[in-house]
């Protein structure tokens, strides 16, 4: 279990203890590669505004520092945040690619070296069905040939089941919890959800 702050600390202060925590998380994931290839990881939280998007981006940065090629996809289609954090346009994104309204090359952005980003894109009415779609799974499978790591920013599990569904085609899941907002009962409920659906939890990150 790692404790980190809320900023893109790996860029602002790479020598900080929070940045070191992200490097520790990176090392833990890389060590797991000996047992199971960890190429697709979804990052979820229990509720909104717990820092999962910040965790996604910081983890992407520390991987990129090892010259690993990283793809970040915003699958929080109801409340997308990645484009806001990185000050990117969200005109077209993953929903447009899967909906055959745009090509991957048109949509993918590179805000930092070795970090590619696909924003959520055009708002769609059936987010859960979208995340369960074979088209999305096939798209992610195809991208695995090009990237060392794919990070999925998924919706909170306490609000919708999208993150649990996405976990079924990911190699591992990281749970982000705000240390001052979650109670034991809520965490136990999420733990039960994970066990029932056999989610492979590879880490828990506590945000301040």
Residue locations for each model-derived region?
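Short boundary/hinge segments that flank catalytic cores
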Residues: 1-49, 54, 184-208
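P-loop/Walker-type NTP enzyme "switch/lid" segment
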Residues: 2-23, 27, 34, 46-47, ...
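Conserved, well-folded catalytic cores of nucleic-acid-processing
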Residues: 28-32, 66, 100-101, 146, ...
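Residues that mark the start of a beta-strand
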Residues: 39-42, 67-71
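Hydrophobic positions on the alpha1 helix immediately C-terminal to the Walker A/P-loop
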Residues: 55, 59
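Aromatic pocket-lining residues of Rossmann-like dinucleotide-binding sites
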Residues: 63
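Conserved catalytic-core segment of NTP-binding enzymes
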Residues: 128-208
